Amino acid sequence: MKKITLMLAIIATALMAQGQVKQIKPSHIYKMPANTSKSLEVLIEENSIYEDLYGGQCSWYCGGVIDTVLASSSLAPSKKFDYKGANAHDFDHESVWAEGAPGQGIGEYLVYYFPGSCPRVTTVKVLNGHVKNPKVWKENSRVKQLKVYYNDVPIAILDLQDSRTLQCFEVGTLGYHDSNASQWTLKFEIMDVYPGTKYQDTVISELYFDGIDVH
């Protein structure tokens, strides 16, 4: 009887968690320039994405830190490039995470590990697809929906536009900002994609964060 009661409680908890999953559209969208051949200094001056990635201004990362980023799979490296999960959080828009599963990567994911003392996260920022230039962006698949898990519990589905842009999502306040707290995680699972014109590989150039507790 106790086993049945426990099983019913687990099922009820899972159903409650699923019911709390919210669908989120981007709150802000910043367009990538078509011409990326300009010097980095000029790009930083002219475009908010480059200023955000390379400008060096104070941000959540003044105190925020990620322990590690792991991917469920990654495309095999070529002679010039690799496609590991950590590339999605290296603040380099030309390096990417490309999943390595058969097909278009539905169900593949990234997991970010945060120390308990890390400032809390409120915003997820995504450079969707291979944004290096318009040609490779179209050729490779892009994410249409990402499911977000906080400590393995699903909390949100991010609805990404099919555009070569930086898309920002307000996800609520996540984390502890407590030196006595344990490590916590955010997982991002590919639920749906926009197919590429040439390759099935689904690509994320950058996935990083903004938040509170740093000023």
Spell out what each predicted region is.
Residues 1-4, 20:
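Positively charged n-region of N-terminal signal peptides that target proteins for export
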Residues 4-13:
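Sec-dependent N-terminal signal peptides
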Residues 15-19:
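Sec/Tat signal peptide C-region and signal peptidase I cleavage site
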Residues 20-40, 45-46, 104-107, 130-215:
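Trp- and acidic/polar-enriched beta-sheet ligand-binding modules for extracellular glycan
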Residues 20-113, 213-215:
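Disordered, acidic Ser/Thr/Pro-rich linker "stalks" and the adjacent N-terminal cap
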Residues 22, 86, 115, 122-126, ...:
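First exposed extracellular module after export/assembly in secreted or surface-exposed proteins
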Residues 105-107, 116-125, 183:
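Extended extracellular/luminal ectodomain segments enriched in beta-structured repeat modules
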